[in-house]
Amino acid sequence: MKTVFCSFGLLMAAVPVFAQNTGKDSIVSTKALDDVVVSASNISRVGDHLVIYPNSQQRKHAVNGFGVLENLNIPGLIIDAKSNQVDVMGLQATLYLNGQECDIREIQMLRPRDIEKIEYYDAPSGKYAKDKLVVNFITKQYRYGGYVQADGLQTIGYDHGDYNVATNYVKGNNSYTVFAGANYSHVDGTETWNNENYQFPQSLFDRESYSKNSYRNHQKYMQFRYQNQKGKRYWVGKFTLVNLSTPRNASSGFAKESTETDIFSNIRKKSLSPKIDLNANLPLSKNQTLTLGVHGKYSANSYHRLYQEQPFEAMTDEDENALSFQLSAIYNYFSQKHSLSVELFHYHDVWNADYSGNCELWQHLWKGESLAFFSYNFQASRRLSLKTRIGLDWLQYHLHGDNSFSQLSPRINTNVQYQLNKGMLLWSFNFVNSNHGMDVINRAMIQVNSHMMEKGMPELKKSHDINTYLYYMGRFNRLSVSAIGQFRYNHHPLTDDYYLDEANGKIVKTYSNGGNAQYYSAILALQYKLCKFANLSGDIRYNHAEVKTTWSKHNNNLTGNLGLNMFMGDFALKPYLHFGKKSLDEAALVISKTPIDYGMSCSYSRGNLYVELQVVSPFKKQEKQYWLDLPICSYSKSIKDQTASQYASIKVAYSLDFGRKTQKVEKDVNKNINSSLLRVE
């Protein structure tokens, strides 16, 4: 009777969700033992992190590690599958698998049943000290056998598919894995309306335009991995090959000033990128470890853009070779009350780029960044712990034909954590230097349209950032609470800049990094277990952003999320609602307005089969708006994106074991392409 009443109440309330789930158990009573909090549930706190053992519901109603993470009892957790970012209370989390850094797409081949536990670090230390928040998936270890696993996703409403296959064989301490996959997007019908104003000394140009987009994108990848592991000692070697191609990104329509003119643009891109990774974790003694990493990557990139607006025409061809490597060494020592670590990193990039068409230019650019840190953690009492991480960052780069840039900057990170009876309070302070992208540091100049050009900016000022926040997490029987207040100050932030080029009669869009930027935010997140098979989650978020550089901009935003998770035998139902928001892009100085986003997923899971159907904003096509308002130029843009609403997707996954059971190895494929090219997208 209680279950029937709860079900009726949930259906009447019809409250939607976002990406979180309360597990079957909650903390009813806790008992502190030194820095370990032993709980009467599947969640406990050990020092600077939570240890979470996913329960049967959280495993059953997930297709992979991504789904398990969505189902965990972490208030304020939001996962953006398109951008591959995990946000917890406004802070970006870094994902690890068995102590190795990865991203969301890298764990899509990890079966929920093979996850032993998940470590959630809200005060990272040791090898994780460089991260704000950490989610580390720990998988079960097996000795013999293998598996074959396949999954596929297909959308309805626009044409998109994502298909993957993996096979793994384990014998003793050795594991051999092959991943392969492909995805594509064929999208037609995205519409853009744009009202632009260009202020020239003798005249003001008002311009209206409309365009419809046709987009084609294809991606293929493969990876071979070998791993040898014995206890806490392991080393892993990986070879990855990624091929990206955008054969068509065409927009056609009209532009109207004094007369109406047809406009057409098309962008073609392709990249081929092999990558080698070597990682090792070496226990030196019972309380000492050494972690080593060597990574190398090469990318061959090409970019072609054609823009026509009679009688004006602009064409840009860009070819680039990019080479990068990374070295890391982390030493850790830990005891009952103290721990320390020494970290050394070096990142090196070299780019060679040829521009042709309207811009004839050859560029050679190299960048090196070396970092050294010393961290010390002290358990002052059963409840109070202190962490200090200090270091130096030496950043250098040189663009051919320009002066070299060199900056030696301090890095400081201090955390104070206090354990409460039913929660935790954390204060964090960070002082870091900013590191700008190499697509900014160049002298290329390309045509955007008949009134505007875009160019890079190699002369940048030294800059630094200060970030501090106060974070609270508490659990009270059925209720989980998280709250955070954050302040960020950027000295010499990088922003878009505009000026008039009288010689060419064009407005030039470039970059500058003077002035400062400030950001304030506050978030309150709640989760409540309604009954045995359902839980409710939600949050409210406020932020204020202000930029004072060549131009001054500010924005206030209040938004929130609601969610409901229901588990009924082999089925799960997860409706969600994201309220609309207004955001300031602090770099582009553009304000955007996103409407309410809602949807629902329904899944079936039994044995090795998982099927999920998702519907996104089915009743109305979303229209996102953008504003840029500067004295020299401004625009008001409205976009109806075919991939943002009125579509559904179906996902099917199946795995087959052979021999004895083995763990499902995480898919560790980074599909990002290294590039320094200046582009108009």
What are these model-predicted stretches?
Residues 55-58, 144-167, 209-212:
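Short strand-turn segments of transmembrane beta-barrel domains in outer membranes
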Residues 62, 73, 101-110, 114-120, ...:
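Exposed, low-structure sequence patches enriched in small/polar residues
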Residues 78-123:
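Periplasmic plug
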Residues 185-324, 350-351, 363-365, 444-448, ...:
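Flexible loop and strand-edge segments within Gram-negative outer membrane beta-barrel domains
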Residues 25, 49-72, 96-98, 152-156:
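Short, polar/charged loop or turn motifs at beta-strand boundaries
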Residues 21-58, 81-83:
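Short, acidic, small-residue-rich periplasmic hinge/interaction motif at the N-terminus
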Residues 35, 65-68, 85, 120, ...:
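N-terminal periplasmic accessory domains that precede
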